[in-house]
Amino acid sequence: MPGSYFSFATMPATFTLGKLERLKRRKVIDQLFSEGKAFTVFPVRVQYLFSALPDAVPLQAGFTASGRNFKKAVDRNRIKRLMREAYRLQKNPLQEQLLQKQKQLGLFFIYTGRELPDYTLVNEKIAVILKRLTRVVNESSAKNT
């Protein structure tokens, strides 16, 4: 449109999932799976670990779907995209909690179901997971003080 101006600076930066917020380093992922804790809110399993992350962000997350349950890469990619979107829109309370407590948390979401989910199911499950993780952050900070 002529005369209109759009800038990324005007967009809220809180609902982003940038490169630094993604869990990518093999060493950190291996540590997460060897030393971390886990719980399941079917059909999503979450592996998490409070640790010093390599980047200066309070929260890093990774996402995966089983190649055993979903043979087509299109299906696996869709599931990961749905989980990333639900996480991106709901991570803010947990992120602010971690900033207040000055902690860093690594997360890995694993889709364990056998059927292709819809967005509402994934959104509900990610919401439950993030609320539970917020409680875990509060409990861990209460133990340390």
PLM segments and residue spans:
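Positively charged, solvent-exposed patches that mediate nucleic-acid binding
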Residues: 1-145
